[in-house]
Regions:
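N-terminal cap/lid segment of alpha/beta-hydrolase-fold proteins
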Residues: 3-41
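Short beta-strand/loop motif that positions the catalytic acidic residue
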Residues: 253, 259-261
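Active-site-adjacent alpha-helix of alpha/beta-hydrolase-fold enzymes
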Residues: 269-291
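Alpha/beta-hydrolase fold nucleophile elbow
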Residues: 113-126
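Cap/lid segment of the alpha/beta-hydrolase catalytic domain
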Residues: 37-111, 159-161, 165-166, 304-317
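C-terminal, loop-rich substrate-recognition/catalytic regions characterized by aromatic stacking residues
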Residues: 196-215, 303, 308-404
Length: 404
């Protein structure tokens, strides 16, 4: 199949403004880095809202191109620290402010000098969540979003898995990222040092019980990570979680979406549900038709780019598996934000998927692929399947009682 051709630096020169303030509806000021192209006319905005620090948009050579690269293609690129993180003011609480702050930031960015009023968003993982949560508020100037590796719900597939708390993901992730960076933002060196040390030995904390008194996240101090303990206090899918569910709000999303997922990504199921949910329930006919998902042989971290490094998981597959993401994003934004003709957008729902083993790309119009046959598989063993070298089996045939 044909991807858009690999694209070098664009024609526009770029300047960067650091820590540009944006005032939210409650008066909190969030800070963004703004990459300005030297264009002679107003240009669209590409926005990223991140909890990992604005500089993180520049340091993933196996993932996205840099903000300056996108800006060189004559876009005004805005990378903002979300509330309570990095240079931004306010108090961080996982997901709680991302819908309203996302709406306010989209409208602020649309009114920036040099903007033509059209805004697209991009980003992966939590930075995909900041897009969806903004989109369900339907800001008038949001035209499209491009989320990657992000689930459809922040209870199922993120914090819990079929009712089981995702300890091995949640604890180290919070210690090493959102709780740590929020402590830096608050200027609390004691908590920063404690979290840094705990994250360095994250595996040793996986055996700690009970979760509700987990020492590294300081249950006695609500400034550290109150969302961790609130999540434990809400082990079922109740109103706490429904506030920021994506799957429950597809009918409020009015924009086309370019989705990216990987076969080895922890959030694959949710990403695919976002695609099928938008095709079925998007707020408008144009939104339902304007869905495209690309599912590659990638994990959550490295997609690989032909002009940088291969994703580690792809080293035995070769360049056929390298990511077309940046060129697809650029073509997608060119179509929806600049009105340019495109063969990759506007033709109805599309699924591009990499067939593992055969190492080929395919395109279809629906998921599951039309004609898919489902097969039930059964776990079995002779009683010694409790190690990686055990005698466990996976068979399409049901085993008789006793393992025979």
């Amino acid at each position: 199949m044909g991807w858009p051709p690999s694209t070098g630096t664009g024609p526009c020169q770029v300047t960067k403004q650091a820590d540009v303030p944006a005032r939210m509806r409650d008066g909190t000021v969030l800070k963004a880095d703004v990459y300005r192209p030297t264009a002679h006319e107003a240009v669209p905005v590409i926005l990223m809202r991140t909890q990992y620090g604005k500089a993180s948009a520049d340091v993933q050579p196996s993932r996205y191109q840099t903000p300056a690269w996108f800006a060189s293609h004559c876009y005004l690129v805005v990378v903002q620290d979300i509330r309570g993180q990095g240079a931004s003011g306010g108090t961080f609480y996982e997901y709680a402010n991302d819908a309203d702050d996302g709406y306010d930031t989209v409208e602020w960015a649309a009114a920036l000098p040099g903007s033509n009023g059209k805004v697209g968003m991009y980003g992966t993982s939590y930075v995909g969540a900041t897009q969806w949560l903004a989109a369900i508020r339907t800001p008038p100037h949001l035209v499209t979003i491009v989320p990657a590796n992000t689930p459809s719900d922040y209870y199922q597939n993120w914090t819990y898995e079929d009712g089981a708390f995702r300890l091995a993901f949640i604890e180290p992730w919070m210690m090493d990222t959102i709780a740590l960076s929020a402590a830096r933002q608050r200027g609390n060196p004691k908590i920063v040092a404690e979290l840094t040390e705990a994250a360095r030995n994250a595996a040793s904390w996986e055996h700690y019980r009970p979760y509700a008194t987990f020492p590294p996240l300081h249950p006695e101090d609500p400034s550290v990570a109150p969302y961790f303990f609130d999540a434990i206090r809400h082990p079922t899918y109740d109103e706490y979680w429904k506030r920021w569910s994506i799957r429950g709000h597809y009918d409020q999303v009015t924009v086309p979406v370019l989705h990216f997922e990987g076969w080895y990504d922890a959030f694959l199921a949710g990403g695919m549900e976002n695609f099928t949910g938008m095709v079925a329930h998007g707020a408008t006919a144009a939104a339902r038709a304007g869905q495209r998902i690309v599912i590659g042989p990638w994990d959550h971290i490295g997609w690989g780019r032909p002009d940088s490094i291969e994703a580690p998981i792809l080293k035995h597959i070769g360049s056929v598996a390298n990511s077309p993401i940046n060129e697809l994003m650029l073509a997608w934004f060119d179509h929806y934000l600049k009105g340019q003709p495109s063969t990759i957008a506007g033709s109805g729902p599309t699924v591009d998927y990499f067939e593992m083993g055969a190492n080929r790309w395919h395109s279809t119009t629906a998921w599951p692929v039309p004609g898919t046959r489902f097969t039930r598989y059964y776990l079995g063993s002779g009683g010694h399947a409790n190690t990686s070298t055990g005698d466990g089996t996976l068979s399409p045939q049901a085993l008789r009682a006793g393992g025979g």
